[in-house]
A protein has these predicted regions:
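Active-site-adjacent substructure of cysteine-protease-like catalytic cores
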Residues: 21-25
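Anionic N-terminal interaction surfaces
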Residues: 1-18
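Acidic, Ser/Thr- and proline-rich intrinsically disordered linker/docking segments
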Residues: 1-4, 26-34, 38-108
């Protein structure tokens, strides 16, 4: 299998108070498996870095942590997700996984 396991930052919006139009956004972490063959591009997610500095993300994240927004091809529609880690770290993990997959195929 050539999927890469990462940690995704997931946002959930809800009403801050009953009867008001004020929205509250909370963040959680979850595992996600990404197929590197469907990744279109990756870039730093500075918005999540700001959210971390504002203490809006889960407490178990280090303040030095970086985030990457990954754009995934889904045919005529795309999907973008934010994962924990710098773009270079994420790319290295995807490259390593793709290389391991090719070695498995060559071994037969």
């Amino acid at each position: 299998m050539n999927n890469v396991k990462r940690t995704e930052v997931v946002s959930k919006r809800s009403l801050a108070n009953e009867g008001t139009a004020v929205m509250k956004e909370t963040y959680t972490l979850r595992e996600v498996y990404i197929n590197p063959e469907h990744v279109v591009c990756m870039r730093s997610d500075n918005l999540m870095k700001r959210r971390l500095a504002e203490n809006l993300l889960p407490n178990d994240l280090d303040q030095r942590q970086e985030f990457t927004k990954i754009y995934i091809n889904r045919g005529h529609a795309g999907l973008d997700i934010t994962v924990v880690g710098s773009p270079s770290l994420i790319q290295n993990k995807m490259f390593e996984t793709a290389l391991e997959h090719k070695r498995e195929i060559l071994k037969g």
